[in-house]
A protein has these predicted regions:
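Asp-box/WD-like beta-propeller blade repeats and closely related beta-sheet repeat scaffolds
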Residues: 1-2, 9
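Short amphipathic alpha-helices and their capping/turn segments at secondary-structure boundaries
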Residues: 2-3, 76
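Nucleotide donor/acceptor-binding cores
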Residues: 4, 134, 184
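Beta-propeller domain segments
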Residues: 12-18, 22-39, 45-177, 194, ...
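Short coil/turn segments at the loop-to-beta-strand junctions that recur within blades
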Residues: 44-48, 182-186
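Generic C-terminus detector
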Residues: 184-214
Length: 214
């Protein structure tokens, strides 16, 4: 975080359950100097990565429960300190239970959206200008319990500000686009200071790759 606070993404111990330790299935804040820590957000089943986006805040991925068909979608969420993001109470007929916060972007269920990073202005890869919105890129590891294989890709997500009828800011609209497919099992993903995008894969002994637009 800009103030130096570390964020620890703590996964759940189960597919669907109420955790005995509330630090599981949550985002934790950590003081890097003292080691003090606490719960920053709950209801987050399995968040792999997050990134700070100026004028938006902290975005983080979250992978929902398995073995429930086309539910729930993989998520990108905007951090609100103290908020509950729904797991394990989210259901197909009630995807955003009362008192919880829904995602600001979604992707195919059970595909494991993992790494995420904000596209810098100096990148040659496509994206919005800072005057119109923000673009992040995310890695999608790939499905393992769907009928047909999905994922194994890099996704571009554009966020643009939304306004109500009175012209007041009301949130963020998102637009998701596949940028590259058949990438194996991508996990971490980062833009370099020069604007190049790098990602690493898990399978096949692991590889580090630079993503280039042709």
């Amino acid at each position: 975080m800009p103030n130096g606070t570390l964020i620890w993404h703590s996964g759940s111990t189960c597919n669907v359950c109420f955790e005995d330790d509330s630090r599981n299935g949550a985002l934790l804040w950590v003081d890097g100097q003292t080691g003090d820590h606490g719960i920053l957000a709950s209801g987050v089943r399995n968040s792999f990565d997050g990134v700070w986006v100026d004028s938006m805040g902290y975005l983080f991925t979250d992978n929902g429960r398995d073995w429930e068909g086309n539910h729930p979608p993989e998520e990108v969420n905007l951090l609100v300190p103290g908020a509950d993001y729904g797991w394990p109470n989210d259901e197909p007929d009630d995807p955003v239970p009362s008192g919880t916060i829904g995602p600001i972007a979604k992707w195919a269920p059970h595909t494991s959206m993992n790494g995420i990073d904000v596209r810098p202005e100096n990148s040659s890869l496509p994206g919005l200008s800072i005057s119109t919105g923000h673009t992040v890129y995310a890695s999608v590891y790939g499905s393992w319990n769907t009928l047909l294989p999905q994922g194994h890709e890099i996704v571009r997500i554009d966020f643009t500000p939304a306004f109500d009828e009175a012209g007041n800011f009301s949130g963020w609209d998102s637009d998701e686009t596949r940028i590259a497919t058949q990438l194996g099992t991508p996990l971490p993903l980062r833009f370099s200071p020069s604007g190049d995008l790098y990602y690493a894969t898990f399978g096949g002994g692991g590889t580090l790759n630079r993503f280039v637009q042709i």
